[in-house]
UniProtKB/Swiss-Prot annotation:
Probable serine protease which may play a role in cellular senescence. Overexpression inhibits cell growth and induce G1 cell cycle arrest. Keywords: Cell cycle, Disulfide bond, Glycoprotein, Hydrolase, Membrane, Protease, Serine protease, Signal-anchor, Transmembrane, Transmembrane helix. The chain crosses the membrane at residues 19-39. The active site is at residues 227, 272, 368. Disulfide bonds join 212-228, 337-353, 364-393. Residues 1-18 are cytoplasmic. One of its GO terms (biological process) is proteolysis. Residues 187-417 form the Peptidase S1 domain. This is Transmembrane protease serine 11A.
Length: 418
């Protein structure tokens, strides 16, 4: 017996050319939209994610010399660790997702130093963070076991996901970082500083009138020049404003107290340094951040390019400016600065000169107490000088004289704990 399947009769239908064209266009459109959505979700719909990592560097010598001028400087250890984490993820399968890392804390422990680092990645928002958290820890564990640069205990590695707001605030609270690229242009004279370019710059004001510059070194402390308080000594009439304009200020704080160096004497101009504590904590943002302080043992060579900022006058006898200005100058050697036609014996220990011997760019009235800064290879900025004194502004053979921060580093620490 043969089985016969039931068949349905068919009739051929010829599609017209225009209908075929429409179908092709529709098909291509669907494919293009699908690919576009896929690209959008895989490439463009990616969000920054922050992860807190910690591990221990096992070396008692680091702990013993922590903070001292020895083989392991804090700055070097921080840079070495950040470079190490960079290399680990750039050499991993997640190199396209990795953005950066930042060491936010180094804590001495009995057998070494605990490192806390914030790692920033970019992933599609659809993926599970818990899975990535474990993967990041796994990558760190595997790579660290084969490292020779630092004796890290691989079993001490811990990784935890952070909320975007907490991660960003933690990164912002780290010193010496800015979001605006360095302006390569070259206050007597200088140029107006872009918004958020120098987020540690502050204006010290007496009865709401600008008197001096100051530099933010924590969320409650600033560094400035002692001579700023020579005339007005009541802290309750002083305020500090932040931002690139004096009016309107981005943020304002009352002064709780200021501490002038005990050995400061106006006639000699030595020990021209003071610290200022504000009455309430400063809220960090892209526009307001703290700068790093160098170690006491750090040295900065003549001819190094540095940057000065301030609201001071544009010429000798002029008035302070509402807009923050910036200028690029160079450190001048003591040998040159102590020449008779320059400043001779007026240059004492704890002072240095910066600017140009031909004049041009210089600090001026109203810039006093403000910052002279430089950056390292990791683009971290350090306060190395405080605007102190000089003859006129931008005059030939009369560069600006600055208080040397490294000379007073231990004094700053003794007063502020920073």
């Amino acid at each position: 017996m043969m089985y016969r399947t039931v068949g349905f009769g068919t009739r051929s239908r010829n599609l017209k050319p225009w209908m075929i064209a429409v179908l092709i266009v529709l098909s291509l459109t669907v494919v293009a939209v699908t690919i576009g959505l896929l690209v959008h979700f895989l490439v463009f719909d990616q969000k920054k994610e922050y992860y807190h990592g910690s591990f221990k560097i096992l070396d008692p010598q680091i702990n013993n010399n922590f903070g001292q001028s020895n083989t392991y400087q804090l700055k070097d250890l921080r840079e070495t660790t950040e470079n190490l984490v960079d290399e680990i993820f750039i050499d991993s399968a997640w190199k396209k997702n990795y953005i950066k890392n930042q060491v936010v804390r180094l804590t001495p422990e009995e057998d070494g130093v605990k490192v806390d680092v914030i790692m920033v990645f970019q992933f599609p928002s659809t993926e599970q963070r818990a899975v990535r958290e474990k993967k990041i820890q796994s990558i760190l564990n595997q790579k660290i076991r084969n490292l020779r640069a630092l004796p890290i205990n691989a079993s001490s590695v811990q990784v935890n996901a952070m909320s975007s707001s907490t991660g960003e605030l933690t990164v912002q609270a780290s010193c010496g970082k800015r979001v605006v690229p360095l302006n390569v242009n070259r206050i007597a004279s200088g140029v107006i500083a872009p918004k958020a370019a120098w987020p540690w710059q502050a204006s010290l004001q007496y009865d709401n009138i600008h008197q001096c510059g100051a530099t933010l070194i924590s969320n409650t402390w600033l560094v400035t020049a002692a001579h700023c308080f020579q005339k007005y000594k009541n802290p309750h009439q002083w305020t500090v404003s932040f931002g690139t304009k004096i009016n309107p200020p981005l943020m304002k704080r009352n002064v709780r107290r200021f501490i002038i160096h005990e050995k400061y004497r106006s006639a000699a101009r030595e020990y021209d340094i003071a610290v200022v504590q504000v009455s309430s904590r400063v809220t960090f943002s892209d526009d307001i951040r703290q700068i790093c302080l160098p170690e006491a043992s750090a040295s900065f060579q003549p001819n190094l390019t540095v940057h000065i900022t301030g609201f001071g006058a544009l010429y000798y006898g002029g008035e302070s400016q509402n807009d923050l200005r910036e200028a690029r100058v160079k450190i001048i050697s003591d040998d040159v600065c102590k020449q008779p036609q320059v400043y001779g014996n007026d240059i004492k220990p704890g002072m240095f000169c910066a600017g140009y011997m031909e004049g041009i760019y210089d600090a001026c009235r109203g810039d006093s107490g403000g910052p002279l800064v430089t950056r390292d290879l990791k683009d971290t900025w350090y306060l190395i000088g405080i605007v102190s004194w000089g003859d006129n502004c931008g005059q030939k053979d009369k560069p600006g004289v600055y208080t040397q921060v490294t000379y007073y580093r231990n004094w700053i620490a003794s007063k502020t704990g920073i």
